[in-house]
Design a protein with these regions (language model features):
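Intrinsically disordered, low-complexity regulatory segments
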Residues: 2-190
């Protein structure tokens, strides 16, 4: 929604002085920032989910707000779990497969959303140096992860333990912290 005050170019209105978005862009895109008097950490939400919620509220079809909206990242297919009030666990994905000659391999197909291939390769090199894994092969293409790991120490563990050992899980607590007009500290976590 634009204000009635517009900037002009060559005497013609071209853009609003102030633009108030109808949808909360910080909630949709996520944000992790600080400013004078506030700090926020918000994980992204799917725009369709937020839009449907707003339309339902405005039309009166949604009267009870959901207690939470799970975060959704583009291109991320890992598991998202609510651990506590506004605390989320973001996990990668692994599979144990039987390869040639009965040898087991661990395939990483997803990593936490704040990771990239360089972070993963660095961790794998460290695990190789420490002896946790014997070797790995990177078959990743573009935005897809496909890493094959050889590890006799990990291959017989359940997938959740493999995720833990390979540090393929992270947790994030969402918050909005600010000072009120009377200089009182306020933390919003709802």
């Amino acid at each position: 929604i634009a204000t009635h005050s517009y900037r002009t170019t060559e005497g013609k209105p071209c853009e609003p002085e102030t633009l108030y978005p109808i949808l909360p862009i910080g909630v949709i895109n996520g944000q992790n920032q600080i400013g004078v008097g506030f700090a926020s950490t918000l994980l992204p939400r799917k725009v369709e989910t937020v839009l449907d919620l707003f339309i339902g509220i405005l039309q009166g079809t949604i009267t009870n707000l959901p207690s939470y909206l799970p975060p959704e990242y583009p291109y991320y297919n890992g598991k998202v779990d609510l651990l506590d009030v506004n605390k989320w666990s973001l996990k990668g994905k692994v599979q144990v497969e039987v390869a040639k000659r009965g040898k087991k391999i661990i395939r990483i197909t997803e990593v936490p959303p704040n990771w990239d291939k360089y972070i993963l390769i660095k961790k794998l090199e460290d695990f190789k140096d420490s002896g946790l894994i014997e070797n790995y092969q990177n078959n990743s293409v573009k935005n897809t992860f496909n890493i094959e790991i050889s590890s006799t120490k990990l291959e017989n563990l359940p997938e959740d333990k493999i995720l833990e050992k390979l540090e393929l899980e992270t947790s994030v607590t969402e918050s909005f912290v600010y000072y009120t007009s009377d200089d009182k500290f306020q933390l919003e976590c709802k």
